[in-house]
Design a protein with these regions (language model features):
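Bacterial N-terminal signal peptides
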Residues: 6-15
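Aromatic-lined, polymer-binding surfaces characteristic
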Residues: 24-26, 30-61, 75-293
């Protein structure tokens, strides 16, 4: 019995230690050290770091503005809140890369401003969505805001006092996560969305799970992984991986939306890998996320996705694909064709260990050609709901 108690204590202690470590969402402290040590050795990655620092410095040189929500997508206030999450993301990463606390202070100041604003907000005044947000006109944007901000918070966590963390978590992050999961007042449409098999739900689960990791809230992480009821039978990120992709990695909403959805899939998966490596998330369902990226590449021509359904002009250069290529190359570095995707179509890298290794291995001449092939990509969870066939000529003419 004593040995059993000690064993349980060691397992629980390991989980709690993993949750308490910062940074550990997009990168770990060891990976930050590797990127710092590699500075000056990979010019293409140095350019990425320079761009991050330039964006962070530009944020520092502008006054913090956290306006009361007033307009929809594209409006001045909407764009300000969108700009704010990018600014916090860049400053959080800049702090980790440089150790300069001016970047951490900027993030802290903005988070405290949001912590004062958020409790005063009802539903957004633009009532065009059945799932209205509070900061934004729809909850989807709120989820995207929280995904980026969770990374920033993770980056500066240890620079904050206990009082600052309590204020920010109590007045901003916890209420926002609860809202994304359940809505508020008489409108609980968010709960249905959170547990839905849909790309908006993937953003929602990623947001709640990532801020759960950053705040050391296992309850939020469990709801993100296994749905509101934590059973995995109704919703959650794991169920989304089961239901939204066919066995071939084809996304049920088509390539254009697969491009958008793969972003929260890979970024949250990276956080899960760092925080809960025992889940082996990148191996889940026969490495379904890697299959999803491979399928996206195959559903393109000269770097653009096939124009089917209601697809807009997007392709392998999209920022979502930069995330996917860099994160998944770091998981499967034997797939050297991903280096060609990055080199031929993207020309930019994530400020993460994956981005560093992609840029480094391209510089080493390790890229292999992208092999496009004739294929049938089945649709549906079991691959029995139709599909899309791609026939390619082997004649270069």
């Amino acid at each position: 019995m004593r040995k059993l108690i000690i064993c349980i204590f060691m397992v629980l202690g390991g989980c709690l230690l993993s949750f308490a470590q910062h940074p550990s969402l997009l990168f770990t402290q060891e990976e930050v050290n590797e990127m710092r040590e590699g500075k000056g050795t990979v010019p293409a990655f140095d350019k990425t770091l320079s761009e991050v620092l330039s964006a962070a410095d530009a944020a520092l040189n502008s006054p913090i503005s956290v306006p009361i929500p007033a307009d929809g997508g594209g409006g001045v206030v909407h764009e300000q809140h969108k700009s704010n999450y990018y600014a916090m993301f860049h400053c959080g990463v800049a702090y980790q890369l440089t150790g300069d606390k001016k970047y951490a202070r900027y993030v802290a100041d903005m988070l405290e401003a949001y912590a004062r604003l958020y409790p005063t907000l009802g539903f957004h005044p633009v009532s065009l969505s059945p799932v209205p947000g509070r900061l934004f006109w729809q909850t989807l944007n709120e989820s995207v805001w929280l995904v980026h901000t969770a990374v920033a918070y993770d980056c500066i966590y240890h620079t904050l006092s206990a009082k600052q963390r309590t204020t920010i978590e109590k007045n901003l992050f916890a209420p926002m996560a609860d809202f994304i999961m359940d809505g508020m007042g008489d409108n609980h449409a968010n709960n249905k969305t959170f547990n839905k098999m849909h790309n908006h739900a993937t953003w929602a689960t990623a947001a709640v799970g990532m801020i759960g990791f950053a705040m050391n809230r296992e309850d939020y992480v469990n709801k993100a992984l296994y749905g509101s009821d934590e059973t995995g039978k109704r919703g959650g990120f794991i169920r989304q991986m089961d239901y939204l992709f066919s066995p071939d990695g084809y996304f049920t909403e088509g390539a254009y939306y697969q491009r958008y959805a793969i972003w929260p899939f890979v970024i949250f998966a990276q956080c899960i890998e760092n925080k809960l490596p025992e889940l082996e998330i990148f191996s889940y369902r026969d490495s379904i996320l890697s299959k999803a990226l491979s399928t996206l590449i195959q559903l393109s021509y000269e770097g653009e996705f096939f124009h089917i359904n209601d697809a807009l002009l997007k392709g392998l250069s999209a920022q979502e694909l930069v995330y996917a290529a860099d994160i998944l190359y770091n998981v499967h570095p034997s797939d050297k064709s991903l280096l060609s995707v990055a080199n031929e179509y993207q020309h930019t890298y994530l400020p993460t260990i994956g981005g560093f290794r992609v840029a480094r291995d391209i510089a080493r001449g390790e890229a292999a050609p992208i092999v496009y092939r004739s294929s049938v990509f089945r649709d549906g969870r079991k691959g029995d709901e139709g599909g899309i066939a791609v026939i390619r000529s082997t004649d270069p003419k």
